């Protein structure tokens, strides 16, 4: 991944590459992405893979809904990745690949493909031998799994979401408890984002209404 950088270094690089004011409502979540990516980039056995990339791209899109100007969104992600020595080009390519799989394959076939792809990305070492023993796993893997299952066509799922997630987690060698915890946290965060956006919308509408009265 290149030379190691501290979180402070990454923050400095990020703000140098993205020298714009970030609205307070988005600042915390972007800081969390920066910390996560920085920590992962400093792990010698961390390798970018498809499910991680998909989790990063999709969650970032969801957490930046309503960001203005929207033309800044892609630049923010690019700057976050660059500041942490993460290859944004590879991230986008992997994410696009999984989107194609979702449209073309059944869930079991996708799981088989992802299992082979992820194991290959860590030098052929079975992830089940590493689960809970290193920093390879990221909550973005859990998000990638959750979004994969959520977005695949119902007729290609071959089971309910909970069973499929469990099967996928086991095949990839991750800790079921850890993935379940991260998925629940993600779902809760998404609900808070939804409520926040509704509040912002109502506030904007009320401001416009008062402006018209004046």
UniProtKB/Swiss-Prot annotation:
Keywords: Coiled coil
Gene Ontology biological process terms from the UniProt entry: photosystem II assembly
Coiled coil residues, start to end: 175-212
Entry superkingdom: Bacteria
Keyword Coiled coil: yes
Function of the molecule: May be involved in photosynthetic membrane biogenesis.
The family this protein is said to belong to: Belongs to the THF1 family.
Name used for this protein in its record: Protein Thf1
Organism: Prochlorococcus marinus (strain SARG / CCMP1375 / SS120)
Taxonomic lineage of the native organism: Bacteria, Bacillati, Cyanobacteriota, Cyanophyceae, Synechococcales
């Amino acid at each position: 991944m290149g030379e190691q950088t501290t979180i402070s270094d990454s923050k400095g690089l990020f703000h140098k590459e993205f020298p714009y004011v970030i609205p307070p409502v988005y600042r915390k979540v972007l800081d969390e992405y920066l910390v996560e990516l920085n920590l992962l980039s400093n792990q010698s056995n961390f390798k970018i893979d498809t499910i991680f990339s998909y989790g990063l791209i999709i969650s970032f899109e969801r957490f930046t809904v309503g960001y203005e100007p929207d033309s800044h969104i892609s630049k923010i992600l690019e700057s976050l990745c660059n500041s942490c020595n993460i290859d944004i080009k590879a991230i986008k390519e992997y994410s696009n690949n999984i989107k194609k799989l979702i449209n073309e394959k059944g869930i079991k076939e996708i799981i088989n493909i992802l299992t082979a792809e992820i194991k290959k990305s860590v030098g052929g070492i079975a992830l089940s031998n590493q689960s809970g023993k290193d920093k390879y796993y990221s909550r973005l893997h859990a998000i990638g799994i959750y979004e994969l299952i959520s977005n695949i066509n119902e007729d290609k799922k071959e089971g309910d979401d909970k069973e499929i997630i469990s099967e996928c987690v086991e095949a990839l060698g991750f800790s079921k408890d850890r993935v379940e915890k991260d998925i629940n946290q993600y779902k809760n965060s998404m609900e808070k984002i939804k409520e926040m956006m509704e509040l912002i919308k109502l506030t904007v509408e009320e401001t416009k209404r008062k402006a018209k009265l004046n």
